Amino acid sequence: MEKQFCLKLNGKCRPESVVQGDKYRFTVLTSQMLRMEYSETGEFEDRPTQIVWNRDFETPKFTVRDQENCLEIDTEYFHLVYDKKEFSPNHLYIDVKYAFTNYGGRWYYGRTDYGDPAREHNLKGTARTLDRCDGEWYVGSGPLERMRTTGGKTNREDGDVDLGMGLCDTSGRTFFDDSESLIMEEDGWVMPRKKGCVDVYFLGYGRDYFHAIHDFYRLSGAVPMLPKYVLGNWWSRYWKYTEETYRELLERFEREHVPF
């Protein structure tokens, strides 16, 4: 790929942010964001991915308590407890401090709900496209046929458009799984990552949704914006222009950096 099309990425984190064992690795990116990796081979990924472009965060304050069968990581905002086995709800949980729910702030690995009875308070994400959608419904190929979109598939039993999990949750914590995204190479191309490796990011930002999105953008890269020059300007003014006033107008557009 041509150099001008290559992105400036930095997948490596700071060594002092890492807590690592034979088959696990935790990276404390901020006092509220944690990367969790598990690999049976003990091989971990430092290259950027399609989702994660930058892991070079300043190391926050945290403490580690490492025992034979128990690892604890404690920051100002969360407390992780892990028994050093394969990641599962039975082996890893994180307590979010400052209790944002009536049922406490404990998150069991992989859970998207909390409480008893279980409930989901995620504020949801976005749909990749609204093609063939009518309001909140997905419209199928048949007459008035309504189906739910779920990961590219459809479910005729429910017609809601699936927005997926978002980064903000009223329970104070959420996560996203980066295990399947492609690796970004230095030459700008992508390649599949090794199978069987778990790569999950935990976010425990409470109700500070702005801060959560802000740090996610540091991790994933800023939202790409259209350059101003592609937008142009439609100028319609019924005025008796002269050659001189035309020149003045166009020169002002140039001074203001407004495309014409």
Task: Name these PLM-found stretches.
Residues 243-249:
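Flexible, glycine/threonine-enriched loop-and-boundary segments that flank and lead into catalytic domains
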Residues 4, 29-68:
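A low-complexity, Ser/Thr/Gly/Pro-enriched, surface-exposed linker/loop concept
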Residues 259:
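Active-site pocket-lining segments that scaffold enzyme catalytic pockets across diverse folds
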Residues 2-13:
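Short, Gly/Pro- and small/polar-rich lid/capping loops
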Residues 65-228, 237-238, 250-255:
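Catalytic and substrate-binding clefts that recognize carbohydrates or anionic sugar/phosphate headgroups
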Residues 234-242:
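Active-site mouth loops of central-metabolism enzymes
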